[in-house]
Swiss-Prot record:
SUPFAM superfamilies: Aldolase. It comes from Actinobacillus pleuropneumoniae serotype 7 (strain AP76). This is 4-hydroxy-tetrahydrodipicolinate synthase. NCBIfam families: dapA (TIGR00674). Pathway: Amino-acid biosynthesis; L-lysine biosynthesis via DAP pathway; (S)-tetrahydrodipicolinate from L-aspartate: step 3/4.
Amino acid sequence: MATPLFHGSIVALVTPMTHGEVNYEELKRLVEHHVQAGTHGIVSVGTTGESTTLSIDENVKVIKKTVEFADGRIPIIAGTGSNATSEAIILTKLLTNSGVAGCLSVVPYYNKPTQEGMYLHYKAIAESTDLPQILYNVPSRTGSDLKPETIGRLAEIPNIVGVKEATGDLTRLPLIKKLAGEDFIFLSGDDATGLESMKLGGQGVISVTNNVAAADMAKMCELALAGKFDEAEAINQRLMALHHDLFIEANPIPVKWAAYKLGLISEPNLRLPLTTLSEAAQPTVLAALQKAGLI
């Protein structure tokens, strides 16, 4: 099978802020950092990019600026999810001709739709655009699980091309591949099990760890996709503390603090109701950065 457009180490990029406002100069530097590090793709304004506390106008501007800064050197995936189908469609339409390579759309959160509701939600979004759509299943945050059987149904829609699975349940991968087809893209949304998912036929990871270990994550994924799992595992083990400890508090709280400690962004701040990493958690994240050899 040919290498799909969406593969390897795709960073779920933080949105840098100064005094509560998006810092576009720092965003430009972050995009350049990932291009130079070999990152295979950028998710702009996903969960890690604080999508829920940006306005629609800010969402669109950040994504369009990310496309501008990337300048065709790396595919940009737009976070366009919402728990209101109509809002997700508005976001998707606003970005259809923006230069993004595709959209990542989270399972509707809080309102807990049925499997049929999720199917109709994604079907309506896909029919509103020609852009490739990636489903995003993260039941620990949404309260709802997009079942493999529903993913299989959605895979029949031509521009629904893949799924980001953030359950960490590796038993789902072969079932999804069976129901959705071998060409359906499976991207792990769980750094700790990302390499294992690639051993089972997954194509990559949409990664939080990549924010602070971009070159290592890119190399690990390249080795894994080449079948060099022992070499990939050596990198993975060095990063394992990060994979876990960047979730010691709700994402993206720890990763923004870690990026700040590495000098990648000038402030670790987030918009309320998210707050900066607690003093009690900081030594744990610092130790993980040290174990990874990043400081």
